[in-house]
Amino acid sequence: MSTLAQPPTYDATTTADTQLTPYLQLSHLLSLTWLAYPILSLIFVAFRLQLSMTSLENSILSVKSDILSSCKAAEHAATAAASMPRYMALATNEQFADAVNGSLHAARVALVVSLTAMEAIINFIIDTYRSTFFCFLELVVTGGLAVLISAVQGINTVLQSVTGSLRTSIQSDIASANSVIQNAINAINKVNPFGNINAPQIAVPSLDALQNVTLPASFQDALTSLNASIPTVADLKGALESIIDTPFELLKTDINDTFTGLSFNSSILPVPEQNRLSFCNDVDLSVIDEIGRDFIKIAKIGVVIIILLALLLIGFNCLLTWYKWRCMKRHLEYTRQAWNTDPTMIHTKTSSSSPPQVILTDHNLMILHANSAHPLITRIMNQLSARLRFSPSHHTNLRWFLHYIFHAPALACFLIGFFGLLSVEIQLLAMGPIVHKFEDSAAAAVSDFSNVIAASINDSMFNQSALYANDINSRVDVIQSTINNGVFGWVNSTTFTLNATINAFYTDIQKAVSTVFNGTVLESPANDFIKCFIGGKVDAIENALTFLHDNLQIDIPRVNDSILVLSPASVHEATAPIAAAAIGGGPNDKEGLIGRLVKAYTATLKKERVMFGLFLALWGIVVLMGVCILIWNTYGQALLKKRRRRRYELEQRSGINGIVVPFRSGVESENEKGAVLDLPSFTPLPSPRRSAFKPFWGSRSNSPMGNQPSGSAESFAIQKEEWDDFPPKPIESTVKKPSRLMAIGRKAMGKERVKADGGEESTSSSSEKSPSDEGIRSTTWVGKFTTLWTKKEPVPQSSEFWDQPSRGRPKLQINVHRDSADAGPNLYSSHTMQSRWSASPDATQTSWGKVMSPSKKTSTTTTATFQTPFGYSTRKSGVPIHDLDQSYDSLSSKSGAPASLPLPLYHGFSGSQSRPSARAEATTTERKDTSPPPPFAPYRTNKLPNPPYDEQRRTSTLRVMNPTFKSSDHTVAMPASRLLTTMDARHSSAINPFITPFDDEHRVTIDNNPVYVRQSIPTNPFGVAL
């Protein structure tokens, strides 16, 4: 092992010209208090919060920029939506032109067909009336003329017959008269004598005129000529049809000519211009600013709180550093007083200025270093152990576990992770109310933005639609005027023509009637009849033509000004996605840019939570490693040792040469064969077979120096099979008979009771509990709590062959220069007194009393003495330091006394050796002790004094260090139990296995001595915070 570099040496006369010291003083430590791990972790968390705040500000600016960019995109989208009239007009113009052209063509065809139908209807009506009238007129006129002609002819015939008969009658009457006259004359003549008288003759007129008497031939000729001159129906029908059809044909020709020139071309229809909207200047971004301001406010509040907390921690750390410095100074004083008052510390000088000559082992220095490095853990564990009455193994394991998990780097990971997670979780919890607060604001902003976009789109659409409607209506007016003036222009002339035609027709009929009945009695009735029959119809036709003249005009519907304007529902449907894309998104308008802002900050916090969680996970790994190490050292190694022991026992079941040695009566045995066979002392044992777990070369058990315990309380506890075995209970060597020396087992020693005079009384009750067990479970809650930390102590088993000490065969030392009275205990190695400031046991040596077994069983406990320099006062070994008053009353200067029990040499041989009990053997095996031969004791003329009464035993968790002795003629008497460094619980004293010289219970008070004057402080010098 390489030696460390030694510090430089200087001349004693060399003086240092600096006021600094090789170590840090209080002012220097106070200047470094701001570098404590909690403060550094808080500073780290504050920097993370500051970075998160900066990231949040950048996110807010990015979100606002994204909103403006989205708004520009929304403007383009809204422009496209507002330009829908243009695209609608492009398609509407084509459809409108096709509709207008189709309408004009249909109107032309309808008009032509209507005129044709009207013409046919009029002709039919006129023909109906004409046919009826002419048929009736022909009947009346022709019949009347025929009657008149027949009447004239009859009258002429009557007149001719009357006039002919009248002429004949006249002529016959005249002829008769002439005849009568003639006769008469003849008769007269006859009588007359006168002669004949000549009868006068009346001349008979010819009366031919009467024979030709007729009506005037002109009247008959007039009637005959009238009857011959009445026109026929076919001629009148053709004339009327030609009169009626002429305007209609002209109208049809005019309509066709007019509609041929009318055509609605879509290329000449107006198209609205594309209107660009601009509404981003009206976007309200106050919601983003407010939510960002609230988030930043939370981060700033967190930073301020962390800074204030760090400042408070700096102040507390300054106080803590001052307190630690004060406790350290007191601790140094405690250490000096502990060394000066410890009876095992043999000093050569009485002055307090001279340092005591003490051997500081590595283990003790490590204990001091651990206590000074983690004073808070030490203080807490001492108080917990005192309150909960932990066993030594529990105390050691838990203290080691706390040292392990709160190692400086692990503690830094824990603090960074804890404070970081705390800050992240607080921010995440604070984000919920903030987000809920701005949900309504975001929804209102989206609604307002939608209204702004809708209003802009509506204004643009109204303007474009009005311009488009005006242009379309002007073109419709031109077409309408063209149709009304061109197509229906005939109404102005045709109505007059029709009226003139009908009036002419009516006039002709009247003329015809007048002509026919001119001067006759039928003229007036015929005129009345014609007026009644035809006049009303003619008047009706004139009224119809007048109505057509007044109402026959085309009125084409005009285009409404809002023809290209969408309904409010359609505008909202078109603008809502645009507004949602600009400000809010998702089904509820909560996942837009505002939602993305919240999600981005939340994602940043979650990433930080993962980072801080990794720090805590690293600390958790350390905790898990510590738990695994505890489990291995507590259970794993014990199980492995048991497994190896069982394997070895199976190999040694057959004994030596097949000879099985029976058990001794009264001696406990753990298995059938026993851990150690009852053989003579120097009987050679068979060599064990080579095992994969143990080598044949030297180990701790077979090394010349014996079993040396490890340098720490942890490694010493590992050597024990159970937790409750640390510190080990005392092994007392009691001489029962002069011929035998039987070691009392560990459990038997645990049952000892101390009488009033300091003697021991062993109990035989196996069920009696030790005082420590009774104290541990004195209360219910403490018993329940400690049950979790303790386990049932198994029956100790024998160790392996490699670790078994040769306690049954003591290594003898024969001194040929001195008598047997001086061959006492090894004062330098095996029976040094126990130091009360050491924290763990040193190498355990078997008492020389076990080597030199007395033959009488009823003898008292063997004691050993050694000397101290003259002038040094020693205290009673059984009195603990906390029992000292303000003066060293219990310390007394004693001179040497002759040994009360000289032991002969032959007691060490096998013939008189008493075999120790199996329980004691197992206990010794567990400690891995050896019994090296006692070294030569220094020559003394005085004998060992009688041991003082053990008035009050002092227990210690530490073993004795080897002090440095100077030549002196004085010795200090110590009991054997004190030399064996046991920790058995005595009924006469309260046991605290965790007491050290630096605890409050062991504070030392010195009276009236300026060298040792100090105040007794009721605090633990190492019980301070980290």
Curated annotation (Swiss-Prot):
Name of the protein in question: Plasma membrane fusion protein PRM1
Annotated keywords: Cell membrane, Conjugation, Glycoprotein, Membrane, Transmembrane, Transmembrane helix
UniProt family annotation: Belongs to the PRM1 family.
Classification of source organism: Eukaryota, Fungi, Dikarya, Basidiomycota, Agaricomycotina
Gene that produces this protein: PRM1
Main function: Involved in cell fusion during mating by stabilizing the plasma membrane fusion event.
Keyword Cell division: no
Gene Ontology terms: biological process: plasma membrane fusion involved in cytogamy
S-S pairs: none
Low complexity compositional bias, start-end: 854-870
Comp. bias (Basic and acidic residues): 749-758
